[in-house]
């Protein structure tokens, strides 16, 4: 009897681990167009809210996760560096210097909530250090 319960428990645990918990966080594909759109929105939001004279660009994506939550929640962990473009200027050709100083590199966790049927993107968390 106990052996059947243990086997059933292990089987359920294995299924949940391999498929993930419904509504739980899962790794996202950085190359997905919706993920890219949310990341661009997150960086634009950061640049709009910061007091930096120059814009920042993502230099490294550390982790991207997504979660179904009345839409899609994207959680980005990224490194951002100061680019060569001042805020308010044309940003199409901004480059990140080859050897940025350590003070110019920040790591951010930015959460974007997407509700495509409402044409809505919203930053719900923005923590940088």
UniProtKB/Swiss-Prot annotation:
UniProt keyword terms in alphabetical order: Disulfide bond, Protease inhibitor, Secreted, Signal, Thiol protease inhibitor
**SUPFAM superfamilies membership:** Cystatin/monellin
Query: Hey, what's the signal peptide range on this chain?
Result: 1-18
What is one Pfam family matched by this protein? Cystatin
Q: Write down the species.
A: Cyprinus carpio
Its localization reads: Secreted
| GO CC annotation terms, alphabetical | cytoplasm; extracellular space; vesicle
Q: Where is this motif: Secondary area of contact?
A: 67-71
Q: Where is this site: Cleavage?
A: 91-92
Q: What CDD domains does this protein map onto?
A: CY
Q: State the name under which the record lists this protein.
A: Cystatin
- S-S bonds: 85-94, 108-128
């Amino acid at each position: 009897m106990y052996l059947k319960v243990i086997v059933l428990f292990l089987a359920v645990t294995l299924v949940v681990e391999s498929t993930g918990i419904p509504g739980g966080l899962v790794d996202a594909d950085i190359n997905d167009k919706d993920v890219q759109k949310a990341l661009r929105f997150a960086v634009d939001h950061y640049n709009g809210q910061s007091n930096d004279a120059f814009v920042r660009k993502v230099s490294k994506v550390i982790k991207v996760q997504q979660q179904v939550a009345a839409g899609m929640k994207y959680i980005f962990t990224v490194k951002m560096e100061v680019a060569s473009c001042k805020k308010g200027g044309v940003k199409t050709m901004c480059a990140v210097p080859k050897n940025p100083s350590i003070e110019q590199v920040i790591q951010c966790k930015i959460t974007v909530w997407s509700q495509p049927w409402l044409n809505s993107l919203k930053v719900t968390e923005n923590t940088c250090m």
